[in-house]
Amino acid sequence: MACSDPEPAKEPVLSGVPTDSVCPAGSKLTYDSWGSTFFATYCTRCHSKTREGEQRNGAPDGYNWDDLNSVRAHQEQIDLMAAASIDVVNHEMPPSDPRPPTSERQKLGEWLACGAP
């Protein structure tokens, strides 16, 4: 999931803390209503199925956040690297601007806790 490493990593090194975010009753966050825009804004400049080789800036192959199935397969890693809750803010990703504010990272944690609908 590294975006600045010159060589693609085999597996990302996870350095964050689980957010233990919860899915609140009535959460309306979905990939279509929120997630796709979040990932397009902050992540897919590296984590995109349309990027290859050096265009991925070190993001491992298969870690494509413009593909909901890939996001769901890597929910734990995304939580550890980029999500937030009331008590925890992981900000390993993205490594450069634009970076999401804490409020958006908290929405990411909520959305992941809800199963990434």
Regions found by a protein language model. Give the residues of each.
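Aromatic- and Gly/Pro-enriched helix-to-coil junctions and flexible linker segments
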Residues: 3-117
